[in-house]
Amino acid sequence: MAGRVSTPGASVVSRVFAVLGAFDERHRGLTLSELSRRAGLPLATTHRLAAELVGLGVLARHESGRYVVGRRIWSLGLLAPVQTGLRELASPFLHDIFAATRATVHLAVREGTEVLYLERLRGSESVPIVSRAGGRLPLHSTGVGKVLLAHAPEQVRSEVLASLRRITPYTVVRPEVLSAQLERVRRDGYATTADEMTLGASSVAVPVLRGAEVVAALGIVVPELRRDRQRLVAGLRVAAQGIGRVLAG
């Protein structure tokens, strides 16, 4: 578990980070006992740290008794260079795509073996969306994730291919199939998905380059891609090139 600390005599800082690390995309709200177990800390220690973090606004506690990440963490996260620089520079281009398509638009980067969503502009309510700005999703089941995975170091690709998880009946979980898809992404310059993360949602994404380096992925989520794929790819490429020029200064 991400937040687990089992070393005797661990510092206060490491214990605080163990508590914060207990939260993830699938564990957004935790009871005290769940928080204690996932952090690998004694219940009394967890209770004391959680109470202090609630007082500081780092955690919040619902009426149900569950703890969630507080607004202060989100506010601090927005100050990170990867958030402020890329997100702000890309914003006009994301809004241009959104205005032209009225579809959900994503800007994302890779963090380890997951997609980190820097921005999400929500489109049609008829398309199911599970992403959120600041949230993380698997690389292998999202359009932006496949772009980032295709251009990730070999070690990252190997780690992802060795632990593919089925999310819907259409999620690609055969390593040889995903490897072939990633090769096409590198060759064609874009990635697509269909019902792989959420049923009823398809996506298309392209890389954002700073020079020769892929620094992010830009994507759109729509009900289906059969008619508009090339038009959406063309629009995304124009926007990605614009972001790349701005990043290059």
Regions found by a protein language model. Give the residues of each.
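Conserved segment of winged-helix/HTH DNA-binding domains
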Residues: R72-A100, S126-I129
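Amphipathic alpha-helical regulatory segments at dimerization interfaces
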Residues: E88-A100, R184, D188, G242, ...
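A structural signal for short hydrophobic beta-strand segments in well-ordered beta-sheet cores
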Residues: L59-A60, L107-A108, V208
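N-terminal helix-turn-helix
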Residues: M1-Q83, Q230, Q241-G249
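Short hydrophobic alpha-helical segments used for membrane anchoring or interfacial signaling
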Residues: L107-G112, L121
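Short, structured helix-loop boundary elements
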Residues: G9-V13, R66, G70, Q83, ...
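Short, solvent-exposed recognition segments
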Residues: E125-M197
